[in-house]
A protein has these predicted regions:
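Phosphate/nucleotide-binding beta-alpha loop and adjacent structural elements of enzyme active sites
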Residues: 1-170
């Protein structure tokens, strides 16, 4: 029950944060984009947010986690039907400075998964573990080997000459 309430509260904070971002971009005069890069697509929240608020020719969304990417893949037809005038491309890669295999720490609460090192002794980590684990015997995260690519190589390979907006969740 604590996990459920915690996630609901986090979703409320996300909603208001997203609304602030959209208001800021509209205030700055942004109404349309040719190309948006969405690094850290998660389950498509940013795809929906940007395509609901802007005219976008193409959005390239990257999600590193194979587990979360499967969820995103299940939603892609919905997004493509909802936003027919936009091209939506999803990729199952991490973005980094070097092309290499890296270890992803896949957390139970998937929006916090990371390729960075986790400090399991930090107060933040301990609080997160307390609030988000239903059963203290459950895993909190597991490591999965994934592919990291260089963004510049991806842009060249896919003939993308300009990027109007880059959204990064790290």
């Amino acid at each position: 029950m604590i996990k459920y309430l915690t996630l609901k509260i986090l979703n409320i904070f996300d909603f208001f944060h997203q609304r602030r971002i959209i208001k800021y971009l509209h205030k700055k005069g942004f109404k349309s984009f040719d190309n948006i890069l969405d690094v850290g697509a998660h389950k498509g929240e940013s795809i929906n947010l940007f395509l609901s608020n802007f005219k976008i020719k193409t959005i390239y969304s990257f999600e590193a986690s194979p587990t979360t990417f499967k969820i995103l893949l299940d939603k892609i037809d919905y997004f493509r039907n909802k936003f027919k005038s936009s091209k939506i491309i999803i990729e199952n890669y991490a973005i980094g400075a070097v092309e290499q295999k890296v270890l992803l720490k896949q957390l139970q609460e998937s929006s916090s998964s990371t390729i960075r090192n986790l400090n399991v002794n930090s107060k933040y980590f301990k609080k997160k573990r307390f609030f988000l684990l239903d059963d203290k015997k459950d895993f909190f995260f597991k490591e999965i080997e994934i592919q990291q690519i260089k963004l510049s190589n991806y842009l060249i390979k896919n003939n993308i000459d300009n990027v109007d907006f880059l959204k990064i969740d790290t």
